[in-house]
Every structure is written in C-alpha cells, then in structure tokens.
Curated annotation (Swiss-Prot):
Quaternary structure and interacting proteins, as annotated: Forms a heterotetramer with IscS; each subunit of the IscS dimer contacts an IscU monomer. Upon overexpression can be isolated a monomer, dimers and other oligomers.
Family: Belongs to the NifU family.
Function: A scaffold on which IscS assembles Fe-S clusters. Subsequently gives the nascent cluster to other proteins. It is likely that Fe-S cluster coordination is flexible as the role of this complex is to build and then hand off Fe-S clusters.
Residue pairs linked by disulfide bridges in the UniProt entry: none
Provenance organism: Haemophilus influenzae (strain ATCC 51907 / DSM 11121 / KW20 / Rd)
One Gene Ontology term, aspect cellular component: cytoplasm
Metal-binding listed as a keyword: yes
Protein's recorded name: Iron-sulfur cluster assembly scaffold protein IscU
Binding site for Zn(2+): 37, 63, 105-106
Length: 126
C-alpha cells in the first residue's frame, strides 16, 4: 500500500498538534475512536464571539492516515463557521489525501471528531 505525498507530508509535518484548555467555554473537544483497538483522535476547536473557528488542535494516536486526516481537518476548519466545519465530509478528506480504501475509516474518525467538538462547544454555550 502506497501513501500519497499529501499523507506523507501531513504525517511527517503534522499541523496544529497540541491541545487547548478544555475548561475554556469557547473550546469544544471531540474524542473519538476505540482506545482498546488503536486509533484515537482528540480534536479541539476554539470559537470566537462571532461563531468562527479561530484555532484548532489535535492529538491522534494511530496510523499515518489517521494523523494526516487530523492534521488536514484542523487546517480546513480554521476561519470557518461551525455550520461550515460541521458540513465537512469524510469523503472530502479521503479524496484530498488520496487515502486507499482500507484507510478511509481514518477520514471517518476526523469527520466524527469535528462533529463531536462542535457538539461539545454548543453544549458549553447552553
């Protein structure tokens, strides 16, 4: 199985690795995956007063495709509204990274993680 140059680039030079303060009311955290079997993805967003994502961070434990999917989605959501970010589909991530069929589940984790982070942020807002 050969990885695309984009997967290799995001794996070797991941963007936005780290974490934001979970206690901050403007930070939403999404944690998805199965710790017992491998891939786990934590994705966090920081939302400004206008509902625009101003920062995004991730920590992913998994294969190169999972890390690349996390890195890519954190780049994509910055500057987007919650609605725009929530509309990102795993198929867009898989297509951009040219993921092989056996790695498409990694892009699904990224889609699930951003949706979970948005839901967490909205829950904090009441």
């Amino acid at each position: 199985m050969a990885y695309s140059e984009k997967v290799i680039d995001h794996y070797e030079n991941p963007r936005n690795v780290g974490s934001l303060d979970k206690k901050d009311s403007n930070v939403g955290t999404g944690m998805v995956g199965a710790p017992a079997c491998g891939d786990v993805m934590q994705l966090q967003i920081k939302v400004d007063d206008n509902g625009i994502i101003e920062d995004a961070k991730f920590k992913t434990y998994g294969c190169g495709s999972a890390i690349a999917s996390s890195s890519l989605i954190t780049e994509w959501v910055k500057g987007k509204s919650l609605e725009e970010a929530g509309a990102i589909k795993n198929s867009q991530i898989a297509e951009e990274l040219e993921l092989p069929p056996v790695k498409v589940h990694c892009s699904i984790l990224a889609e699930d993680a951003i949706k979970a982070a948005i839901a967490d942020y909205k829950a904090k807002q009441g």
